[in-house]
From Swiss-Prot:
Source taxonomy: Bacteria, Bacillati, Bacillota, Bacilli, Bacillales
Keywords assigned by UniProt, alphabetized: ATP-binding, Kinase, Nucleotide-binding, Serine/threonine-protein kinase, Transferase
Gene: rsbW
Molecular-function annotations in GO: ATP binding; protein serine kinase activity; protein serine/threonine kinase activity; sigma factor antagonist activity
Protein name: Serine-protein kinase RsbW
Pfam families attached to this UniProt entry: HATPase_c_2
């Protein structure tokens, strides 16, 4: 029988090679918690984006040598995932101003590349908070029981 709260922690090198390991772990955690297939897939995309951003941007000044910490907190009605690094931070407001949503009439040949990670994370998860002190920490929550989801327009908090 599952306890009301479980906690799993991973610490991996900031390397793209470990994204698949993190995704596999996430699948197991979400499956054990009783999440739907769609919730598992949404969370895998969101976590992949957050980890890939850390791999690409956090340690670029340090020859991509660094560590990414991933925490899964499994609660009765939700799963909270925290991804953190100690690398370079970024200006959230500037980054956000450059991301979607895209205009459906926009010519696909002129769509800007990159910058979709935060947009995808916000779109796929129920709650998202970005902390920018001492690196970047992204906290995201996926509710397993959907009645818990807050119905608000802006779900990303910055602190």
């Amino acid at each position: 029988m599952q306890s009301k709260e479980d906690f799993i922690e991973m610490r991996v090198p900031a390397s793209a090679e470990y994204v698949s390991l993190i995704r596999l772990t996430l699948s197991g955690v979400f499956s054990r918690a009783g999440a739907t297939y769609d919730d598992i897939e949404d969370a895998k995309i969101a976590v992949s984006e957050a980890v890939t951003n850390a791999v690409k941007h956090a340690y670029k000044e340090n020859n991509n040598v660094g560590i990414i910490n991933i925490y899964f907190e499994i609660l009765e009605d939700k799963i909270k995932i925290v991804i953190s690094d100690k690398g370079d931070s970024f200006d959230y407001e500037t980054t956000k101003s450059k991301i979607g949503p895209y205009d459906k009439n926009e010519n696909i040949d002129f769509l800007r590349e990159g910058g979709l990670g935060l947009f995808l994370i916000e779109s796929l998860m129920d709650e998202v908070t970005v902390y920018k002190e001492s690196g970047v920490t992204i906290s995201m929550t996926k509710y397993i029981k959907k009645e818990q989801v807050r119905n608000n327009g802006e779900r990303v908090e910055i602190s």
